[in-house]
């Protein structure tokens, strides 16, 4: 596990972009795994400005809310199109289908996509409770793509994106922890003091399902990029 501490979110995002650019330019990155939320927004803005050619790169995403159409401004389809896909050309882009009514079939469909497009670099954020994707504390390390019940803390963290608290979805489709760990390389991004405790448990704590991100200690190629605040408890 390589640890990089930077001055701020912009510097950390640029460091992550360097790794991604190098992988794409060398031809080592054919599939790029992407995350959503506030953490990677600056990375995507920098990627849009970058000269790196992504037309032969396929993308996959970690998760999507259950019940939201791709056209819904709160869906992750919309988020990705707004911040990245409408501004940068990729070969193909895959996300779980939030409108799928057969959860088992949708999860199997997405796992098939992941098997056809093995992830070369997976970008991750981390929740204040240590979740990666929507894999909440207690999720099995053997989990593959699944339908998850969102915890109160996760819904609370995401309610700022919705007009009303009751509009925040209660479920999501998420790549499982095993699905994430199958990526050849992982870049974990964390910025801000509110992520410091989760980062401490991820890097220094025991590998335990109560902090899902702690499983990254078992991955052979992880780069953790932090700002000074997120690194403050290390």
From Swiss-Prot:
- Which gene holds the coding sequence for this protein? nagB
Family that this chain belongs to: Belongs to the glucosamine/galactosamine-6-phosphate isomerase family. NagB subfamily.
Superkingdom field: Bacteria
| Keyword hit for Hydrolase | yes
Principal EC category: hydrolase
CDD domains referenced in this protein's UniProt entry, alphabetically: GlcN6P_deaminase
Give the Gene Ontology MF terms in alphabetical order. Answer: glucosamine-6-phosphate deaminase activity; identical protein binding
- Pathway participation: Amino-sugar metabolism; N-acetylneuraminate degradation; D-fructose 6-phosphate from N-acetylneuraminate: step 5/5
Keywords, A to Z, come to: Carbohydrate metabolism, Hydrolase
Recorded hits in InterPro entries, A to Z, give: Glc/Gal-6P_isomerase, Glucosamine6P_isomerase, Glucosamine6P_isomerase_CS, NagB/RpiA_transferase-like
Q: Which reaction does it catalyse?
A: alpha-D-glucosamine 6-phosphate + H2O = beta-D-fructose 6-phosphate + NH4(+)
Q: What is this protein called?
A: Glucosamine-6-phosphate deaminase
User: Which function does this protein serve?
Assistant: Catalyzes the reversible isomerization-deamination of glucosamine 6-phosphate (GlcN6P) to form fructose 6-phosphate (Fru6P) and ammonium ion.
Q: Which residues form the active site?
A: 63, 129, 131, 136
Task: Give the Enzyme Commission number.
Answer: 3.5.99.6
- Gene3D superfamilies from the UniProt entry: 3.40.50.1360
Annotated GO CC locations: cytoplasm
A GO BP entry is: N-acetylglucosamine catabolic process
Q: Does the keyword RNA-binding apply?
A: no
């Amino acid at each position: 596990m390589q640890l990089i501490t930077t001055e701020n979110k912009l510097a950390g995002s640029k460091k992550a972009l360097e790794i991604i650019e190098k992988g794409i330019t060398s031809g080592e990155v054919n599939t790029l795994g992407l995350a959503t939320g506030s953490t990677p927004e600056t990375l995507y803005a920098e990627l849009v400005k970058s000269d790196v050619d992504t037309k032969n790169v396929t993308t996959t995403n970690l998760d999507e809310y259950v019940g939201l159409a791709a056209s819904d401004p709160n869906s992750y389809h919309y988020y990705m199109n707004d911040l990245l896909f409408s501004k940068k050309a990729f070969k193909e882009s895959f996300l779980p289908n939030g409108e799928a009514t057969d959860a088992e079939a949708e999860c199997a469909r997405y796992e098939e996509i992941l098997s056809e497009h093995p992830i070369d670099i997976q970008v991750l954020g981390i929740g204040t409770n240590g979740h990666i994707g929507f894999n909440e504390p207690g999720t099995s390390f053997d989990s593959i793509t699944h339908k998850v019940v969102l915890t109160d803390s996760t819904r609370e963290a995401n309610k700022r994106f919705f007009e009303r608290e009751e509009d925040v979805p209660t479920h999501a489709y998420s790549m499982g922890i095993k699905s994430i760990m199958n990526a050849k390389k992982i870049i974990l991004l964390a910025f801000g003091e509110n992520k410091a405790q989760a980062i401490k448990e991820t890097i220094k704590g025991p590998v335990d399902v109560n902090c899902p991100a702690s499983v990254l200690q078992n991955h052979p190629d992880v780069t953790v990029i932090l700002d000074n605040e997120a690194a403050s408890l290390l």
